[in-house]
């Protein structure tokens, strides 16, 4: 089964997936891609614009996970306005949801933060601090956390996620804050794979050339 992991970051969502799947990760920042590769040595890692990579390659995969950048959607945007900083919400989020819903024949999930505005497309589910849009059912999951994410140190975040970044990686706290909790990533993948196996034959959906 082939999985595409877009805007992969250092791979919080992917940490517990194991090695039974063929995973391709796409990350635009080289230093982040390097950290991901060191943590997930069996994955193919592509340094590229994930949004463009998606439209050019979506037919090669059985399952797609996309986590478009969240800052322009987050509630911090309203706080920044008090400092005279204004920004448009990045519509790539909704472009990908709509595109995948209408043109992708496998299973997909798009993840983002809970926004400061009413969502333009109704999400499938809210888990932890995130919303998820998918074309398969996702069952509820409660995430236990004994710290404030906004104030947590990189050490606390590293322990929570079970991710130890390579020593020379910069922006460790930021990268760890951006991670989807690994147990959430595994839960959603299991939902996607279970639904996929009921409805499709892996790696034949788009032809044998994959």
Locate predicted features.
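Class I S-adenosyl-L-methionine
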Residues: 53-63, 70-210
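SAM cofactor-binding core of SAM-dependent methyltransferases
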Residues: 2-54
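Short N-terminal signal/transit or membrane-insertion segments
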Residues: 1-9, 84-91
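Solvent-exposed polar/charged
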Residues: 19, 38, 66, 99-102
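Short, charged low-complexity linear motifs
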Residues: 1-3, 21-22, 113-120
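Glycine-rich His-Gly loop
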Residues: 8-9, 66-68
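Short glycine-rich, polar/acidic loop-and-turn segments at beta strand-coil junctions
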Residues: 29-30, 68-70
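Generic enzyme active-site microenvironment
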Residues: 3, 25, 65, 109-110
């Amino acid at each position: 089964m082939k999985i595409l992991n877009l805007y992969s970051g250092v791979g919080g969502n992917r940490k517990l997936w194991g090695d039974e799947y063929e995973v391709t990760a796409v990350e635009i920042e080289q230093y982040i891609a390097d950290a991901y590769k060191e943590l997930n040595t069996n994955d193919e890692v592509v340094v590229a614009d994930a949004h463009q990579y998606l439209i050019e390659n979506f037919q090669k995969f059985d399952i797609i996970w996309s986590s478009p950048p969240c800052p322009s959607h987050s509630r911090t945007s309203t706080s920044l306005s008090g400092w005279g900083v204004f920004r448009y919400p990045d519509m790539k989020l909704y472009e990908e949801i709509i595109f995948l819903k209408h043109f992708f024949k496998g299973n997909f999930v798009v993840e983002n933060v809970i926004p400061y505005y009413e969502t333009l497309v109704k999400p499938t589910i809210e888990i932890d601090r995130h919303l998820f849009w998918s074309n398969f059912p996702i069952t509820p999951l409660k995430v236990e956390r004994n710290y404030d994410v906004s104030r947590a140190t990189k050490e606390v975040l590293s322990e929570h996620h079970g991710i130890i970044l390579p020593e020379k990686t910069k922006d460790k706290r930021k990268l760890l804050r951006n991670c989807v909790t690994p147990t959430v990533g595994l839960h959603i993948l299991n939902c996607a794979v279970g639904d996929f196996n009921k409805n499709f034959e892996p790696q034949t959906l788009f032809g044998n050339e994959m």
